[in-house]
Amino acid sequence: MRKHESLYLAFWVVRIREFRTKMNLSQEKLAEKLHVNTRNYQKLERGVHKPSAITIIPFLYLLSDQEIISFTRSFGQMVEKAHSQEVA
């Protein structure tokens, strides 16, 4: 997974911001739901900090089952595409 760490970080930044916007949540409110302080959430959203399992699990809990499937499939497809470009 280390090989795709930068891809994951970029993916996370886009997805968490999309989710926050879609749900009409402030950074403060989403930080509260993820059990992190606002400053750390802001760093997560900018890609300064990598999300930990302690952050990802509460985030997944906020998603519907279908959104979780979409989230994981999208990441898998992105990794597969990056891998196929490396091989080519």
Can you annotate each of these PLM segments?
Residues 20, 31, 60:
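The alpha-helix within a helix-turn-helix
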